[in-house]
Amino acid sequence: HYQIILKKNIPNCISNSFFISISDINDEKLSRDGYSITISTHSKAIFWEGLTKDEYEAKKEFTQNFIIKEFLNNFDNIKQENIKTLFSATSKTFYRYINRTNCGGKPITAKTIFQLPSCNTPFYGLYNVGDTVFAGQGWPGVAIGVNVLNKELNANS
């Protein structure tokens, strides 16, 4: 995992950094045809609302191209021609898949840095995992959310 911190904010985003997760080459699911690389950053959900389809696609493509250019500037061994499949998503994409426009989770602050969020729900056998529990980016956010659940389920073992 890497985090690239830039001098200026990413266009159409509220951050000057992006987080990179790279699959393990031995991962038969994610790396079957080469490495899988996920890049994530922060953007306000409301920014993507009220745009025409053309405006939306243009802004999304502009942001994607900016991030890819900065990504390639930081990795000498990866070239544009190495990218076989490329797509980007916004809060509208997020909504289409999980019916939420924003990430969930409890933000980490100076007061909460040593507190693990709860994965419990009021329903027996139903737990929250992933970014619902830990508001992290990419695979680390998912993994930490699952780790919280694992500790909860095995606490009395």
Question: Model-found features: residue ranges?
Answer:
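A glycine-rich dinucleotide-binding beta-alpha-beta segment and adjacent secondary-structure elements
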Residues: N73-A135
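Short glycine/proline-enriched loop/turn "hinge" motifs that connect secondary-structure elements
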Residues: D27-G34, P117-P122
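Conserved FAD/dinucleotide-binding core of flavoprotein oxidoreductases
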Residues: S31-E70
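Short helix/loop capping segments that flank catalytic or ligand/cofactor-binding pockets
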Residues: E28-L30, W48-E49, G136-G138, E152
